[in-house]
């Protein structure tokens, strides 16, 4: 299955009159943001699936590259996440990804990461699918066998030509030519690399490391770019998990669910009987409310703030000192 670009919001298909009518209909029902009702649903749920997006890590200080914040040096961030962009200018693409690696290496998991890790420890029938490539879920102690990194990892390195792969590369910068993307600045001061008005010295392809195995291909970030296939073995494992039994509850966290095939898991979970709970700042916006079906939940909150509260009946009070102890 290939990673597809974000689809237009389905709400654009409907007229404003229809959207308003749908909103009135759902408002008349039991509150979609009733924490007590969600707690009851959580307590009665055995098999739980989660789909996480960039919003999960936003409170850790990582940019989501969505909406108004979707530009990097005046480049649409999604336009840099393609193999064709890498072939056209590997230095520019690597600067973008080295910057992201640098930011992730300095970020720390937030309470939402820890809450999901705690849920995994308490419930062995919980499976988390993350679209994030930042490694923060792993840092929070999320059990590896209950975590699927759909889009790979910034800290894996692949070859553009052969099957060579290196896992767990934390070099910062990745290579000397990328040092401008690994600069630390004082809080409140601008990062020079992000100032599009400042000229950017081009990076020669000769400065990008070649594959140590085939000696032909370039080393590239081990993430899934738009148009590329997701890991087939991982995808088959997720399908098998879905087929094993009914799904009681699905958490959709920090994502507007516009990128496929990941977004398709929401419909698959519904077909297996799952109630859907969306935790995302835009979840209660009028243009999103048409998605909230009877019995489902929508919490227009930041995951770091709200997820520990929502999961509290199962995980208990989240320890505030976990960060210092980890």
UniProtKB/Swiss-Prot annotation:
GO biological process: negative regulation of cellular respiration
Range annotated as the organelle transit peptide: 1-26
Binding site for Zn(2+): 159, 162, 211, 214
Annotated positions binding substrate: 97, 100
Location of the Deacetylase sirtuin-type domain: 28-324
Subcellular location: Mitochondrion; Cytoplasm, Cytosol; Nucleus; Chromosome
SUPFAM superfamilies noted in UniProt: DHS-like NAD/FAD-binding domain
Cofactor (UniProt): Zn(2+)
Pfam family, any one: SIR2
Catalytic activities: N(6)-acetyl-L-lysyl-[protein] + NAD(+) + H2O = 2''-O-acetyl-ADP-D-ribose + nicotinamide + L-lysyl-[protein]; N(6)-(2E)-butenoyl-L-lysyl-[protein] + H2O = (2E)-2-butenoate + L-lysyl-[protein]
Gene3D superfamilies membership: SIR2/SIRT2 'Small Domain (3.30.1600.10), TPP-binding domain (3.40.50.1220)
Active site, per annotation: 151
Organism superkingdom: Eukaryota
PROSITE patterns per record: SIRTUIN (PS50305)
Role of this protein: NAD-dependent protein-lysine deacylase that decrotonylates the PDC (pyruvate dehydrogenase complex) subunit LAT1 at 'Lys-148' to inhibit PDC activity and consequently ATP production. Also decrotonylates histone H3 crotonylated at 'Lys-18' (H3K18cr), to repress the expression of genes involved in aerobic respiration. May also act as a NAD-dependent deacetylase. Does not mediate desuccinylation, demalonylation, or deglutarylation of LAT1.
Protein name (Swiss-Prot/TrEMBL): NAD-dependent protein deacylase SIR5
The organism's taxonomic lineage, starting at the top: Eukaryota, Fungi, Dikarya, Ascomycota, Pezizomycotina
Gene name for this UniProt entry: SIR5
């Amino acid at each position: 299955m290939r990673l597809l670009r974000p689809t237009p919001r389905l709400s654009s298909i409907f007229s404003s009159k229809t959207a308003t009518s749908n909103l009135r209909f759902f408002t008349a029902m039991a509150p979609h943001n009733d924490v007590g009702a969600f707690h009851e649903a959580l307590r009665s749920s055995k098999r739980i699936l989660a789909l996480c997006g960039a919003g999960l890590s936003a409170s850790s200080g990582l940019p989501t590259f969505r909406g108004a914040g979707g530009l990097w040096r005046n480049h649409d961030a999604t336009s840099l996440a393609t193999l064709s962009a890498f072939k056209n200018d590997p230095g520019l693409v690597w600067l973008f990804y080295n910057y992201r690696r640098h930011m992730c290496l300095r970020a720390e998991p937030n309470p939402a990461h820890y809450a999901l890790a705690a849920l995994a420890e308490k419930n062995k029938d919980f499976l988390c699918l993350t679209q994030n490539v930042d490694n923060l879920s792993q840092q929070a102690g999320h059990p590896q066998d209950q975590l699927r990194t759909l889009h790979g990892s910034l800290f894996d390195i692949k070859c553009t030509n052969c099957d060579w792969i290196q896992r767990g590369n934390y070099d910062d910068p990745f290579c000397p030519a990328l040092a401008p993307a690994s600069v630390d600045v004082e809080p409140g001061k601008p990062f020079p690399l992000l100032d599009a008005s400042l000229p950017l010295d081009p990076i020669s392809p000769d400065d990008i490391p070649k594959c140590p195995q085939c000696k032909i291909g370039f080393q590239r970030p081990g993430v899934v770019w738009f148009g590329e296939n997701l890991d087939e073995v991982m995808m088959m494992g997720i399908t098998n998990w879905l087929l094993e039994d009914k799904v009681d509850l699905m958490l959709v966290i920090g994502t507007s669910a516009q990128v496929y095939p990941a977004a398709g898991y929401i419909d698959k979970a519904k077909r297996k009987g799952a109630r859907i709970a969306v935790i995302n700042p835009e979840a209660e916006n009028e243009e999103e409310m048409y998605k909230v079906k009877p019995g489902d939940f929508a919490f227009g909150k930041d995951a770091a703030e709200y997820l520990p509260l929502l999961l509290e009946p199962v995980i208990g009070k989240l320890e505030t000192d976990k960060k210092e102890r980890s």
